[in-house]
Amino acid sequence: MKISRSLSTVEVHTGGEAFRIVTSGLPRLPGDTIVQRRAWLKAHADEIRRALMFEPRGHADMYGGYLTEPVSPNADFGVIFVHNEGYSDHCGHGVIALSTAAVELGWVQRTVPETRVGIDAPCGFIEAFVQWDGEHAGPVRFVNVPSFIWRRDVSVDTPSFGTVTGDIAYGGAFYFYVDGAPFDLPVRESAVEKLIRFGAEVKAAANATYPVVHPEIPEINHIYGTIIANAPRHAGSTQANCCVFADREVDRSPTGSGTGGRVAQLYQRGLLAAGDTLVNESIVGTVFKGRVLRETTVGDFPAVIPEVEGSAHICGFANWIVDERDPLTYGFLVR
């Protein structure tokens, strides 16, 4: 066996959604910003993403993040988010996973009852706070990036579902938000194939019709996914939602950046008051909470700073190797 690369990871899930943290084995990443480092990886080392996200080491719905040095004075570390299609600008469930791992594993100075974790991401600096009792990490809340509605009541035409109307909003990534009830789309595991088809068609049509660009971060210039809302299964939840993103990937969690965007959407539509909490349920019944911290602006857009809360758990540690003799060493996807 000839090992050309060895990578160490911490395996975490947030509300059921996997997050693989790469802690060692990456090449040195040039660049003064996280976006520059991500661009270098895309151009020069994308095979690492494929090796860790694709089968046989991963699967079609895998997600992860590469730890890197911070680029801002208040950050403890930086992260580059990866998934089956490529690289994302923000990942709320990843922030919760990273913050939990940082506290559980002592990557940051821990304080009781709450420990602060600063993370540099492609979308900007994110500050998280982890409950810590001296032995165990608890729920994580993070201050999301400024979030806003980009367009209201926009329509797209899809091959299988006809005209679909919703809002395009930003919570760290752009999403097309739509009510699933008119299309008989319950947010349940049993409907996942229909949810995937609907979400993928809406995302493709929206990207073809609406050329989004973040007013302050021009590199964020596409609609990342479709978020489909419907009735929750738990009495205490406000709603359930399913995020179909990247290449037909389904988020098992309620989607952190999507929850931030939903908070902005509901607040700006007058459906969520200051001080109220959105209890957002996932396709598997796990929950994130979101609320408005304060109002702000992004370019010419009125916006809010949301806070999002959820929990994560470490479920393993792994060492992965790349053997160039293996014809499948950089992975494959059946779906």
Swiss-Prot record:
The active site is at C91. One of its GO terms (molecular function) is trans-L-3-hydroxyproline dehydratase activity. It catalyses: trans-3-hydroxy-L-proline = 1-pyrroline-2-carboxylate + H2O. Its EC number is 4.2.1.77. Pfam families: Pro_racemase. Belongs to the proline racemase family. Homodimer. Catalyzes the dehydration of trans-3-hydroxy-L-proline (t3LHyp) to Delta(1)-pyrroline-2-carboxylate (Pyr2C). Does not possess neither proline racemase nor 4-hydroxyproline 2-epimerase activities. This is Trans-3-hydroxy-L-proline dehydratase. It comes from Burkholderia cenocepacia (strain HI2424).
